[in-house]
Amino acid sequence: MTDSPEETTVRVAVGRITRAHGVHGEVGVQVRTDDPDRRFAAGAVLTTDTGVTLTVQRTRWHSGRLLVRFAGIDDRTTAEDLRGRVLFAEVDERVRPEDPEEYYDYQLIGMRVETVTGQEIGVVREVLHLPGQDVLAIERSADGDAFVPFVAALVPEVDVDQRRLRIDPPPGLLEL
């Protein structure tokens, strides 16, 4: 008899609802996953950042944008109520994104943050999924939180194994 390790899941952001499409409850989704066909497959269960559970009924691509129909969302008004919501899926925590430049929130939260010159800044407290880009909320001991856009130019190094990331902030960014 073999013992298999118990699967532990974590919540990962897979998309953000942009707006209603049409009058029958479809919504546009800004995809934030490396595998949209699997994450948004019919029957997939997702939760929103407000805790609402949604089941994917069907999807289709339209003009380069993913359109999703959720069970029980049958009209434009109900669909519009979902506008701006971040969608999360449960993922086995042992699975990493295929793209080595992509990270799940749980991999970043709790990481030590330092500048490229070695100055300690703090710890990643949260990943904010804003309409334009993701932003790292960095908890600092004395100066309150710092907010750094999670883009390669400002975050040139992420070391998941060492639980550390390095930032290259322009002058004044950490003082905002």
UniProtKB/Swiss-Prot annotation:
- Superkingdom per UniProt: Bacteria
User: What biological process terms from GO does the record include?
Assistant: ribosomal small subunit biogenesis; rRNA processing
Any Gene Ontology CC annotation:
cytoplasm
All residue ranges annotated as the PRC barrel domain in the record: 100-173
* Entry keyword rRNA processing: yes
Q: Which UniProt keywords apply?
A: Chaperone, Cytoplasm, Ribosome biogenesis, rRNA processing
SS bond list? none
Principal localization reads cytoplasm
Q: Which GO terms describe its molecular function?
A: ribosome binding
User: Which range is the signal sequence, renumbered to this chain?
Assistant: none
Q: Which SUPFAM superfamilies match?
A: PRC-barrel domain, Translation proteins
Identify the Pfam families for this entry: PRC_RimM, RimM
The subcellular localization recorded is: Cytoplasm
Q: How does it assemble?
A: Binds ribosomal protein uS19.
Which family does this protein fall into?
A: Belongs to the RimM family.
UniProt note: domains = The PRC barrel domain binds ribosomal protein uS19.
Please describe what this protein does: An accessory protein needed during the final step in the assembly of 30S ribosomal subunit, possibly for assembly of the head region. Essential for efficient processing of 16S rRNA. May be needed both before and after RbfA during the maturation of 16S rRNA. It has affinity for free ribosomal 30S subunits but not for 70S ribosomes.
**NCBIfam families attached to this UniProt entry:** 16S_RimM (TIGR02273)
Write the protein's name. Ribosome maturation factor RimM
Organism of provenance: Acidothermus cellulolyticus (strain ATCC 43068 / DSM 8971 / 11B)
